[in-house]
């Protein structure tokens, strides 16, 4: 089923989407379509990628206009002893790929500096700062944002869950940094986050 007709609706209706649906609903597939559609490095492949689909003959103004930063938190280990390391490892891999893939848009040394930063928060802060300074636009995707937190809630209880997601919890802090990058003249111009409905 061609779901590319929904791209224009997403673009028209809001800059920040939060989609909660049951498993097997097609959320991840739709995110992949959006990633490829908006990626500035794939702009010249539009006809090849989308030519036979609805959006191929109905492109939107923002097609191919963004640096795409994406995360899939399904890959984060929910074991409390491994969680922070696993989260930082996942994010480090995503930031490494982002820095390599979009290196030409940044000043020399961007990738090396990114590699040297010790955790997800610092990598995110650096990315936001550099993109803002260079007037670059980022489309941020997070698939299964609630995957490991739901596992912790189910297996460890509300106390552990709140320690991560409330107050000074590291996951809360990470989302506060995202919010900072998406407000005012921040470089995160669009965001699409998916989760699983209970």
State where each predicted segment sits.
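Phosphate-binding site recognition
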Residues: 1-198
